[in-house]
């Protein structure tokens, strides 16, 4: 088996690649077709979570063609474990397009990532002890999640038929799950939504779906797939796939407004120089990025990297909506972050620790990094990565991932420390 993964944003790519590497699979991550050497998995990193459906599907099918040409024979559409996708979202249409392209009538819907508190019970997605719709994800600026029932979300996006395998079946093991799958297939179900409470459930599901040419989900299922691959191949986890992270000029850029990112920013502000982005300047001042870059460069003599952040609380976001009206503040901030990244790279800043999927995409694109070595995980779902030419070392973190101390912990890994 050579696994081909299509991930819908940069941080999601790092997330799943890290789990595959931890599971022993030699993994290459890229954002465009490249010559891939010897590997067990290829992760194609796209930025399609919040773009128009037609363009998202087009990019996915192009990525699929590349992965097929690269010798992949099993495929994994990776989206966020919080299923970031409203009624106008792309998960349903992309899943439909992949099923059609691969000529498979049925696939799996498995967003769960128990290690980070994302579980599914009776088809409802939970974030720790809260329904998704009751969690801070209801305030997400791009994809506010107001429903927790996965089948309802998918039905609002796609005419495909949805079915469930509930926890009472999962608990009976892979043979029972296979039987349930066959019954759902016979009933014409296209998307099988599976309950997952813990990592053991993921192993059961991975074993039961080994003959699926296409699965979809968060990164949790990758743990199960890697585990099964390791059992079948007889190979051990290859820790040599990781690299030693070097201390270099660095910056922390926080663009996410997630609840965890807010906690991480608040914690890190007590430890290192920090600068809150001025939204008005992002909109009006084309020279603002130069001012911010100068500030970052002035603070390179600290033990911990200076932080530039646009992280805001829900009340602050609401104030901004009232203040700026129809102005596209998010786009202006991203454009500023892109200019900032370019200016810092010109001044030999080589370590970028980035919080937020959209912001991570902007930074990686600006740096022109399109293929990566995957390092050891900092926290579940987040690893250091290095550009293949060694020029840049990056942390591309989903806003919700990582511990409160994450931004500090990432830098404690310099020079081989753990």
Where does each model-flagged region fall?
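N-terminal basic/disordered segments at the start of proteins
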Residues: 1-38, 58-62, 112-115
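Cap/lid and interdomain-hinge subdomains that line or gate substrate/regulatory clefts
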Residues: 1-4, 30, 56, 64-74, ...
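Short glycine-rich or small-residue beta-strand-to-loop segments that form or flank ligand, phosphate
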Residues: 2-7, 42-50, 73-84, 195, ...
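A structural-propensity feature for long, helix-poor, extended segments
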Residues: 39-48, 301-304, 386-418
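Conserved, well-structured core segments that form the ligand-binding/active-site neighborhood
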Residues: 128-295
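C-terminal structural cap/anchor segments
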Residues: 296-355
């Amino acid at each position: 088996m050579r696994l081909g993964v299509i991930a819908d944003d940069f941080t999601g790519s790092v997330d799943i690649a890290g789990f595959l590497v931890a599971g022993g699979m030699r993994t290459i991550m890229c954002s465009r077709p490249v010559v891939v050497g010897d590997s067990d998995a290829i992760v194609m990193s796209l930025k399609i979570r919040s773009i128009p459906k037609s363009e998202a599907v087009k990019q996915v099918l192009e990525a699929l063609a590349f992965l097929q040409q690269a010798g992949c024979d099993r495929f994994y559409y990776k989206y966020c474990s919080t299923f970031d996708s409203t009624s106008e979202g792309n998960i349903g249409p992309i899943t439909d397009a992949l099923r059609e392209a691969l000529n498979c009538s049925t696939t799996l819907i498995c967003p769960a990532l128990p290690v980070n508190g994302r579980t599914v019970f009776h088809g409802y997605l939970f974030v720790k002890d809260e329904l998704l719709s009751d969690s801070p994800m209801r305030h997400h600026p791009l994809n506010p999640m107001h429903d927790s029932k996965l089948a309802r979300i998918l039905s609002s996006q796609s005419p495909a038929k949805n079915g469930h395998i509930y926890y009472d079946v999962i608990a009976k093991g892979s043979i029972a799950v296979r039987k349930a799958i066959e019954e759902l297939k016979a009933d014409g179900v296209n998307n099988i939504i599976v309950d997952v409470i813990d990592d053991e459930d993921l192993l059961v599901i991975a074993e039961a779906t080994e003959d699926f040419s296409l699965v979809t989900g968060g990164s949790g299922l990758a743990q199960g797939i890697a585990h099964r691959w390791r059992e079948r191949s007889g190979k051990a986890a290859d820790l040599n796939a990781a690299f030693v992270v070097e201390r270099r000029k660095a910056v922390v850029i926080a663009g996410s407004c997630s609840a965890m990112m807010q906690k991480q920013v608040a914690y890190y502000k007590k430890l290192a120089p920090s600068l809150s982005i001025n939204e008005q300047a992002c909109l009006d001042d084309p020279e603002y990025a130069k001012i911010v870059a100068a500030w970052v460069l002035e603070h390179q003599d600290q033990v911990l990297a200076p932080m530039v952040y646009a992280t805001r609380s829900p009340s602050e976001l609401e104030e901004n909506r009232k203040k700026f009206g129809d102005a596209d503040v998010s786009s202006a901030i991203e454009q500023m972050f892109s200019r900032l990244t370019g200016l810092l790279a010109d001044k030999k800043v080589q370590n970028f620790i980035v919080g937020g999927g959209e912001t991570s995409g902007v930074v990686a694109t600006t740096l022109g990094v399109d293929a990566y070595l995957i390092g050891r995980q900092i926290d579940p779902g987040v690893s250091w990565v290095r550009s293949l030419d060694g020029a840049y070392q990056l942390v591309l973190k989903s806003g919700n991932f990582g511990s409160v101390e994450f931004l500090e912990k990432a830098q404690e890994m310099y020079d081989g420390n753990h």
